[in-house]
């Protein structure tokens, strides 16, 4: 087995507004078991596909995909802050390979990432710098968005590159499943917030970041009382999506439009594209077997919360 995968939902609300203790314990056991499997695999390289939430990427320049040559986690919502351990030579070679394959991958030598990257590194690996990691941003919240097909091809291109490294490679996908938290939309905000989305939102002062956290907490409290205050979770679609990735039927999603996905499951459900990229990268290493599937809708976290592992069959 030269390639392993784990995909996991993230939520900024952990520790800020939590479900009952039995649910917390259940999720904690899922994460603990996944972390133990990853430790047993002992990856030599990690490729992490994750979104951003207007913390590192803004409308001044909004690429569909970006690979970090260097990356720093900002520590939003109490997540880990600090420097990711990016092997620059491997990242540069990966970018060249992916571009040569026909995927227009941007690069950043000053990438900033938020909880979407930090949580899986913390929960599944034990820290930001425990393993060499290639951080791959996938734009999942700022229209215009990449399609499922392009994300699948991105993952395949990265997987074909890592296949040639002769290393044990771990692919991580972060985000989803169905959810629509109160993320600002450029077409619907006032001039001040539009300016934030266009770039002035970098390095927010602590009081403004705290206010953002509190807005999300209040939205979650209201959502628990009435799921019509935001787009409702869609467990049926979430389970369908888990079936797709579990059975390596990724191309079935190619014709699902961005607008239809938003209508079905919420505008932030596009974060599942990070999972599609990760599974596509794994598939480039050979046929895979998925294991340890978990799903629970958790209104307190405004998320259909999912987790799944997979490994190549050779």
Swiss-Prot record:
Catalytic EC class = oxidoreductase
Question: Entry's Pfam families?
Answer: LigB
Keyword Oxidoreductase included in the entry's annotation: yes
Question: Which InterPro entries does its entry note?
Answer: DHPP/DHXA_dioxygenase (IPR023789), Xdiol_dOase_suB (IPR004183)
* Name of the protein this chain belongs to: 2,3-dihydroxyphenylpropionate/2,3-dihydroxicinnamic acid 1,2-dioxygenase 2
Keyword Repeat annotated: no
This chain's function reads: Catalyzes the non-heme iron(II)-dependent oxidative cleavage of 2,3-dihydroxyphenylpropionic acid and 2,3-dihydroxicinnamic acid into 2-hydroxy-6-ketononadienedioate and 2-hydroxy-6-ketononatrienedioate, respectively.
Cofactor (UniProt): Fe(2+)
Assembly with partners or alone:
Homotetramer.
Catalytic function, reaction form:
3-(2,3-dihydroxyphenyl)propanoate + O2 = (2Z,4E)-2-hydroxy-6-oxonona-2,4-dienedioate + H(+); (2E)-3-(2,3-dihydroxyphenyl)prop-2-enoate + O2 = (2Z,4E,7E)-2-hydroxy-6-oxonona-2,4,7-trienedioate + H(+)
Q: Name one GO molecular function term.
A: 3-carboxyethylcatechol 2,3-dioxygenase activity
Q: Where is the active site?
A: 115 (proton donor), 179 (proton acceptor)
**Keyword set, alphabetical order:** Aromatic hydrocarbons catabolism, Dioxygenase, Iron, Oxidoreductase, Plasmid
UniProt GO BP: 3-phenylpropionate catabolic process
Q: Which family is this sequence assigned to?
A: Belongs to the LigB/MhpB extradiol dioxygenase family.
EC number of the protein = 1.13.11.16
What does the record give as its pathway?
A: Aromatic compound metabolism; 3-phenylpropanoate degradation
């Amino acid at each position: 087995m030269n390639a392993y995968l784990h995909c996991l939902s993230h939520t900024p609300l952990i520790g800020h507004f939590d479900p009952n203790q039995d649910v917390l314990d259940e999720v904690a056991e899922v994460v603990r078991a996944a972390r133990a499997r990853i430790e047993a695999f002992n990856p030599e390289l990690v490729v992490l596909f994750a979104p951003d939430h207007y913390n590192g990427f803004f409308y001044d320049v909004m690429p569909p995909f970006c690979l970090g040559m260097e990356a720093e986690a900002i520590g939003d919502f109490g997540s880990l802050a600090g420097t990711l351990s990016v092997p620059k030579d491997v990242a540069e070679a990966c970018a060249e390979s992916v571009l040569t394959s026909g995927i227009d991958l941007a690069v950043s030598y000053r990438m900033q990432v938020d909880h979407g990257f930090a949580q899986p590194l913390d929960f599944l690996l034990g820290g930001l710098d425990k393993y060499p990691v290639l951080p791959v941003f996938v734009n999942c919240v700022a229209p215009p968005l990449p399609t499922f097909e392009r994300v699948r091809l991105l993952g395949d291109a990265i997987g074909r590159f890592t296949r040639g490294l002769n290393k044990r490679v771990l692919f991580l996908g972060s985000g989803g499943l169905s959810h629509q938290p109160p993320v600002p939309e450029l077409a619907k905000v006032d001039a001040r917030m539009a300016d934030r989305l266009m770039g002035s939102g970098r390095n927010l002062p602590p009081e403004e970041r705290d206010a953002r956290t509190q807005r999300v907490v209040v939205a979650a409290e209201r959502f628990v009382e009435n799921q019509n205050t935001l787009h409702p979770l869609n467990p049926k679609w979430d389970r369908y999506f888990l079936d797709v990735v579990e059975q390596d039927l990724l191309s079935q999603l190619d014709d699902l439009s961005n607008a239809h996905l938003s209508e079905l499951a919420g505008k932030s459900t596009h974060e599942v594209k990070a999972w599609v990229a990760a599974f596509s990268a794994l598939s480039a290493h050979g046929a895979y077997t998925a294991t340890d599937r978990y799903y629970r809708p958790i209104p307190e976290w405004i998320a259909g919360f999912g987790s799944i592992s997979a490994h190549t069959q050779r």
